[in-house]
């Protein structure tokens, strides 16, 4: 066994703040080294008992709110703070593997998953890590040609020395305003990814930054210069937002020097993400769509704008709002939504934004919202779960919320 070094400095004492999946991956990795003491702070009361000056390094889980007491104290030790991705980078930087980082408010999970899928379909060894669910250090022993990393603004705030071969920002809209002073601060946290990337681009249709290389969207298809490359109907996806996601993937592959025509064939096979605008079933003429991964206002707006051309959506909305500005969805609600059922911890907060702009009802929980929606829905209408909120008031995560929705649809079908 060997001692643990970071930036050529021997580390003998490390504090781990937070012990979720990321913290556990760091702890498991460090178990391979000798001569290092690791202390773990799992809650506020434990944290205040540690002398931060006494540690060589401090790893912080992305879920730790650095803007709130007692964790504000960490801001004085920025040079000591490292993320799990910094540690991962230290141990792969001398290999030939290429690293790609993608951040954004909406679309990043689809982009990284599609990129990883295409790379594998083209015959490369690719790993997909980061905010999407698999901590980078869990893959440290694998051999790979490409490492695709989904990064959140919280993770970027913790970066120390990582250098990605390519960084990309897509579609930044207000989110996590419970962790940032305002939207500008949140947006800047995303843009900071450029500081840790050798090559970098932004594709943000919401803020008018449409770097697209030679690509453009015309009547539901992607063109390169004047040549049509791909029509949305040739894919297993739907909606203009997915054409935008594909353009980002094509730009990533372009910058990696890969064959775009071969990539197009791979993209046609990509089935999309679970819990992201997935049609569950049609029951009694009503289509039920699971977009549980829509955890902020921007994501729900994208779903509303892509699913239909009629005012035939019954929307299930609610959970933990994270300070979101629900007034931004009023235009889409007016155009596409027949009725809204609002549920969850912040239902009154959401109501304060949309009251007077649409028909709605407050519900106790998602199950009640579903039951009322299924009773109201007529043939050729859509019941859409796109909550625009986090789920942890009622569920363990967006995946469980989506699974519960799917089970409710299955139960409804059995009764029909």
From Swiss-Prot:
It comes from the Bacteria. One of its GO terms (molecular function) is ATP binding. Keywords: ATP-binding, Cell cycle, Cell division, Cell shape, Cell wall biogenesis/degradation, Cytoplasm, Ligase, Nucleotide-binding, Peptidoglycan synthesis. Its main location: cytoplasm. It catalyses: UDP-N-acetyl-alpha-D-muramoyl-L-alanine + D-glutamate + ATP = UDP-N-acetyl-alpha-D-muramoyl-L-alanyl-D-glutamate + ADP + phosphate + H(+). ATP binds at residues 104-110. Its EC number is 6.3.2.9. It is found in: Cytoplasm. The keyword ATP-binding applies. Pathway: Cell wall biogenesis; peptidoglycan biosynthesis. GO terms for biological process: cell division; cell wall organization; peptidoglycan biosynthetic process; regulation of cell shape. SUPFAM superfamilies: MurD-like peptide ligases, catalytic domain, MurD-like peptide ligases, peptide-binding domain. Gene3D superfamilies: Mur ligase, C-terminal domain, Mur-like, catalytic domain. One of its GO terms (cellular component) is cytoplasm. Cell wall formation. Catalyzes the addition of glutamate to the nucleotide precursor UDP-N-acetylmuramoyl-L-alanine (UMA). NCBIfam families: murD (TIGR01087). Belongs to the MurCDEF family. This is UDP-N-acetylmuramoylalanine--D-glutamate ligase. It comes from Francisella tularensis subsp. holarctica (strain LVS).
